[in-house]
Structure formats: structure tokens, C-alpha cells
Amino acid sequence: MADRTPLLRINDLRVGFDLPEGRLVAVDGVSFQIQRGATVALVGESGSGKSVISQTIMGLLPRSAKVFGGSVLFADPNKPGTITDIVRLSPNGAEMRSLRGGRISIIFQEPMTSLSPLHTIGNQIREAKGMKLKLLLD
């Protein structure tokens, strides 16, 4: 029987920015999950929280941002049975750095500056993975 544990599960995520006038809520109670092998696109209006959600998943929130609720649970296929709450990791800690780029990656909002229109997305991803593998082996 195949493992049906979601690869990534976002539960009631709440992220905001504490300002002198009070808290500006950027993400308010967002929940979704991503199954193994799935490709997901976060789509929404400008200012809807897509980038903040992505930055939270990657552990790349700016210092002015704060996760004040929820969880981002990652079930690493390389560590069966282990679920890591990314929100609880130190953004600059060894565990987060090992996940970022190697296990979890994101293409941000401006695909024309991130991707080449002359090559398929699949080829570009394969090339990036090959370059990372080469760096690891060197």
C-alpha cells in the first residue's frame, strides 16, 4: 500500500507584520496540502499572500514578518515516518539549510526572470538538479 501522507501540509497558517500601528495580517488561516509527485501553483491577486506563504515554506521570511499561528509540515521522503514543522526550524539552522534548495524549492512570481522561454520547464529543472548534484559531488 502506498504512503498517502502528504509531502507538505500547511495547517491554519497565520503570518503577519508587526507595525507601529498594529499587526498587518498577510496570511490568515490558510490550509492546503501537497501530495508526493504533485506540482502546485499558488495563484491569486496581488497582495493575496502568495509570496508570504512561499517565503514561510522556504524559511525565508523577512525579519519584520512573524508566524503567529499554524504549521508547515514536511514529510521528507528520504526520512520515512519523519515529519518536520518548518515553522519551528531556525531559518539559518543546518536543518533548514539542508531542506532549502535540496528538498524544497520554489519559483517565485516572476517566471519570465526565473525561467527561459526557449526551454521546457522540465529541462530547466533537470539542469538545476544536475548542477546541484555536481556541486555536492565536487
Please name every model-derived segment.
Residues 1-138:
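ABC transporter nucleotide-binding domains
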